[in-house]
C-alpha cells in the first residue's frame, strides 16, 4: 500500500442554517454531465433537544464558470410521509439509464430506527435556477433492506454502475452491534415507477477494516466508501474514509463482484 500526503483546498464549509454546525460525508458524482456533491449538513437544530432535522442532505453543483461549488438543494422528508425525522444522511442523487432520477438516503426516524430508503424525484428540479438553497420535499419512499440481527445500522455507501436502463449495483455499509465496526457489502437493485426490487446481495461482506490506518484513528474500525469511478471495462476505483483520519483508494473487479452477487441472487 502506497501512502502519500497531498495539499487540499476547502471547497465546502458551514455557511447556511442547514449546515452551520458542520459539513461531512460528501459524495461527488455526475448527473447528466454535471458534477454534483451531496453531503450531510449538521443543521441549526443539531444540538436542539427537540430532535428534529438535526442533519439534512445538502446538494451542491459545480459551476464551471465560477470554478466553485454552489449549494443548491436541501432534501427534506415530508412529515406526512415519514413522520418526524431526527437525521437524514448517507445520501446522493442517482440517474438510471432510462433517465429516471432517484434519491438514496438513510433517515433516522423518531422511533429510533434507521431506514435504507429510495425516493423518486422529478428530474426538472435539476434545472431550477437561482443561487439560493432550495428545499425539496421528499413525498415518497421505498424501504430497500432491513438489518440483520447482528447489525446496528445500514447506510448507502456509493453507487457503482448501472446495468441497462433499470438496474443498479451499489455498495452499502453496515455496522455490527458488538464492536460498531464498519463493513461493506454490495446489492443489485431494479428500479421502476412501480417498485424497487432487491435482486441480489453479496452473501458476505466484501470489505472490512484490515490495515492499521483503518483500525486506528479518530473513529476506529471504520471503512466508509463515498465515491466510485469506472476506469476500465472490469475495474472501478473506490474512494473511502479510513478511521475518519485518512482517505483510501481501492480497486474493485466488477467480474468478481458479479460472481459474488450471483451467490446471493434473489431474483
Task: Cite the ranges covered by each PLM segment.
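Conserved positions at the start
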Residues: 23-25, 88-91, 155-157, 225
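Beta-rich carbohydrate-recognition and catalytic domains
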Residues: 1-20, 31-87, 94-152, 162-218, ...
Amino acid at each position: 500500500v502506497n501512502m502519500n500526503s497531498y495539499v487540499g483546498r476547502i471547497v465546502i464549509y458551514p455557511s447556511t442554517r442547514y449546515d452551520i454546525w458542520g459539513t461531512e460525508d460528501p459524495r461527488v458524482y455526475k448527473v447528466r454531465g454535471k458534477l454534483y456533491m451531496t453531503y450531510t449538513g449538521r443543521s441549526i437544530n443539531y444540538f436542539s433537544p427537540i430532535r428534529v432535522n438535526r442533519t439534512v442532505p445538502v446538494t451542491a453543483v459545480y459551476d464551471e464558470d465560477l470554478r466553485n461549488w454552489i449549494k443548491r438543494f436541501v432534501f427534506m422528508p415530508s412529515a406526512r410521509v415519514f413522520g418526524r425525522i431526527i437525521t437524514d444522511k448517507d445520501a446522493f442523487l442517482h440517474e438510471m439509464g432510462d433517465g429516471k432520477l432517484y434519491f438514496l438516503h438513510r433517515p433516522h426516524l423518531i422511533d429510533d430506527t434507521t431506514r435504507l430508503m429510495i425516493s423518486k424525484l422529478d428530474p426538472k428540479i435539476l434545472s431550477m435556477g437561482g443561487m439560493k438553497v432550495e428545499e425539496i420535499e421528499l413525498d415518497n419512499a421505498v424501504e430497500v433492506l432491513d438489518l440483520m440481527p447482528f447489525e446496528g445500522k445500514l447506510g448507502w455507501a456509493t453507487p457503482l454502475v448501472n446495468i441497462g436502463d433499470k438496474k443498479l449495483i451499489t455498495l452499502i455499509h453496515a455496522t455490527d452491534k458488538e464492536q460498531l465496526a464498519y463493513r461493506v457489502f454490495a446489492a443489485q437493485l431494479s428500479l421502476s415507477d412501480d417498485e424497487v426490487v432487491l435482486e441480489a446481495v453479496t452473501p458476505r461482506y466484501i470489505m472490512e477494516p484490515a490495515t492499521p490506518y483503518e483500525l486506528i484513528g479518530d473513529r476506529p474500525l471504520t471503512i466508509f466508501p463515498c465515491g466510485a469511478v469506472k476506469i476500465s471495462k472490469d475495474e472501478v476505483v473506490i474512494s473511502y474514509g479510513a478511521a475518519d483520519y485518512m482517505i483510501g483508494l481501492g480497486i474493485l473487479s466488477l467480474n468478481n463482484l458479479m460472481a459474488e452477487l450471483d451467490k446471493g441472487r434473489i431474483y
